[in-house]
A protein has these predicted regions:
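Active-site signature of alpha/beta-hydrolase-fold catalytic machinery across serine-
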Residues: 72, 157, 161
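Short active-site segment of divalent metal-dependent hydrolases/proteases
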Residues: 16, 154-155
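Active-site-proximal alpha-helix that buttresses catalytic centers in soluble enzyme cores
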Residues: 6, 11-79
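Acidic, low-complexity terminal tails and accessory targeting/binding regions
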Residues: 1-7, 50-51, 79-83, 90-101, ...
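Phosphate-handling substructures
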Residues: 32, 75-132, 194
Length: 200
């Protein structure tokens, strides 16, 4: 029961102009991390290095903001990283490019964070996608310690799946840019070690 299968440290990509504006996006090629984002990733990389624990593998979403962040981490740890398409952000469909405030005004009768955007991905389907890819990653890295560089929403989904929190409540979990979240996966359960950690 207490035999650990895998330990995953999720790193949220560094700040972007969209993230700072609370703007929904699932574009792969824009926006890049900004100056603040680069600084955040360097700080979290230093935190990882100081812990001195071996990282067996680094994975990343293929989105530009994530691969830029992963490259900084991989260079410092002197490792390569692998992109996985299923680690991309939720497909926001017609909401893509809008801020949370703009959508709240447009759809005042909807729970923007939980509802399914037109031509987009339902929150439960999104969480299942993340659960499925994490199960696949874990099966390939048994007894390993890995890093996944991805989006806040992906990390929220991972936490919800690990702790069996309903998908529609995942927006209540705050994940800061450039932060680390760690989950230990066991045979029949998972443990959230820490969430949204940002080095002082």
């Amino acid at each position: 029961m207490f035999q650990r299968k895998c330990k995953i440290t999720f790193i949220c990509h560094g700040s972007t102009i969209y993230l700072e504006d609370n703007r929904f996006t699932n574009k792969l090629d824009y926006p890049p991390i900004n100056e603040n984002g680069e600084s955040e990733i360097k700080k979290i990389t230093d935190f990882i290095k100081k812990r001195g624990l071996k990282t067996n593998k680094i994975y990343s979403s293929p989105a530009l903001c994530c691969t830029q962040s992963a490259e900084i981490i991989a260079d410092e740890l002197k490792q390569d990283f692998e992109t996985i398409n299923a680690l991309t952000n939720r497909n926001y469909g017609d909401w893509n490019g809008y801020t949370f405030e703009e959508l709240t005004k447009k759809y005042n009768d909807k729970n923007i964070s939980a509802d399914c955007p037109e031509n987009g991905e339902d929150i439960k389907d999104f969480n299942k996608r993340i659960n499925d890819i994490l199960a696949e990653i874990i099966s390939k890295n048994l007894r390993g310690r890995i890093i996944i560089v991805t989006h806040p929403e992906v990390i929220q989904a991972a936490i919800c799946n690990a702790l069996k929190i309903p998908a529609e409540n995942e927006y209540k979990i705050y994940i800061r840019p450039g932060s680390a979240t760690q989950i230990s996966y066991f045979t029949d359960w998972a443990s959230l070690v820490y969430s949204g950690h940002v080095p002082i």
